Amino acid sequence: MLVHYLAVSSLAHRKRLFNSKTKGFHGEIVMDWGMKNRLTRLIQRDGKALFLPVDHGYFQGPTHGLEKPEKTLKAIYQYADAIMLTRGVLRNCIDPAIEKPIILRVSGAVTVVGEDLANESVVTSIQEILRLNVSAVSMSVFAGTKYENKSLSNLAKLVDECEDYGVPVMAVTAVGKELEKREARYLALVARVSAELGARVVKTYYCKENFEKVVEGCPVPVVMAGGPKTETQKEVFDFVYDGMQKGAIGVNLGRNVWQTENPVAAIRGIRAVVHDNYTPQEALDLFNQVKAGKA
């Protein structure tokens, strides 16, 4: 049974989702073997997940810290549960013998110098997705923009194609350049709409106020995005810990890992919070120990 698929930290949310008759979780009964297999690769046996995105180049170009993706990943990928990237980086920078699950970014065709980041299209076919043998796909969802209908329609069509082949879709709540949108009311709306359209996992931003409402209003697992790099490492551990306590199953953090002074120490600290229930201070202590070569 896929008992850990919808495991969350929030007890109330867990009780609401749990199906006592089947000893599993609501939604599992309609999943085929392929879908279950892919999801169990992404979400670990403790019901938690640490995804490492290195897909930023699809709209930012050679981002600081990702000038050479293969070099960036070499030291840190082992600490992630899955890696999120584009097909170009996958083909050219990743060893085909890698056993780490891959989440393929399939939306794009916009850049930071263009008119509107919300005007994304799906840039990969289902044939390509299967050819690359990935564990899941991801695409951005822009609600509240002039491209809202296009964005949500693209998500629905992608879900239709991927469900036919047992490939889970992760919807990525996107705000573009409008960072002020990162409040609970907006995030809860996008998360719920994405789940209603068939996304199996939702990636959204953390917000200090009412984040539990974002999670409780979403019937599929929620992972937290990192957003712009924080000023201190403690801030990262603080929001990851708080978000996990409020029901998120994990994180999808990139810049707050590979743009830090010590990416290995950063991802090990984050992993300790996600999988080992470390407090922010315990994670910071581990970060400093790794940084000093003592752990």
Feature map (PLM): residue ranges:
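Short secondary-structure boundary segments
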Residues: 54, 87, 141, 206, ...
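Conserved N-terminal beta1-alpha1 strand-loop-helix module at the mouth
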Residues: 24-99, 104
